[in-house]
């Protein structure tokens, strides 16, 4: 088996190993990336997801590299070489899969969790992912974003105000 084929088989095997049960859709809210902001108190980047009905938002603190990746995709500003999220998109596509949706599923001990739902030749696969990585992939693939309803009530973090230097949609 050629090295490239072996690599693709190993990636597909890893995706299958991460398979878990499908999550319920009844308690999910469709959201979109509203903006990337900086937390005024810490200077940390925050991705703000807004309920598509426009009445609620959820702020998730993320890393600078992920914020840069999300912002560059929001503004269609592609670097000359692929970053990690571009690579993941390419691997999924080359394995004849697609990202069907992303769901931010829970908040546990101050950390948000999400799943990347993939349609693969063998069926649907849910892969645990950091929300920032899952959001970056959703933006690159056009996959819809969802947040579990309970997370809007569970968070007590204020959404950072919008400033002039933020990356908005």
Q: Residues of each region from the PLM?
A:
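Divalent-cation
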Residues: 21-64, 68-169
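Bacterial N-terminal signal peptides that target proteins for export
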Residues: 1-7
């Amino acid at each position: 088996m050629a090295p490239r084929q072996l690599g693709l088989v190993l990636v597909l095997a890893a995706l299958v190993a991460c398979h878990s049960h499908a999550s319920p859709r009844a308690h999910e809210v469709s959201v979109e990336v509203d903006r990337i902001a900086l937390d005024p108190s810490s200077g940390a980047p925050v991705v703000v997801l807004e309920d598509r009905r426009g009445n609620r938002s959820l702020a998730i603190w993320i890393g600078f590299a992920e914020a840069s990746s999300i912002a560059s995709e929001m503004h269609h500003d592609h670097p000359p070489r692929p970053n990690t999220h571009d690579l993941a998109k390419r691997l999924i596509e080359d394995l004849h899969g697609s990202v069907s949706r992303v769901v931010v599923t829970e908040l546990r001990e101050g950390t948000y969790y999400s799943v990347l739902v993939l349609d693969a030749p063998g069926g649907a696969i849910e892969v645990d992912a950091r929300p920032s990585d899952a959001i970056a992939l959703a933006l690159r693939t056009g996959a819809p974003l969802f947040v579990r309803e309970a997370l809007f009530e569970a968070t007590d973090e204020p959404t950072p105000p919008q400033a002039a230097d933020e990356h908005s949609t």
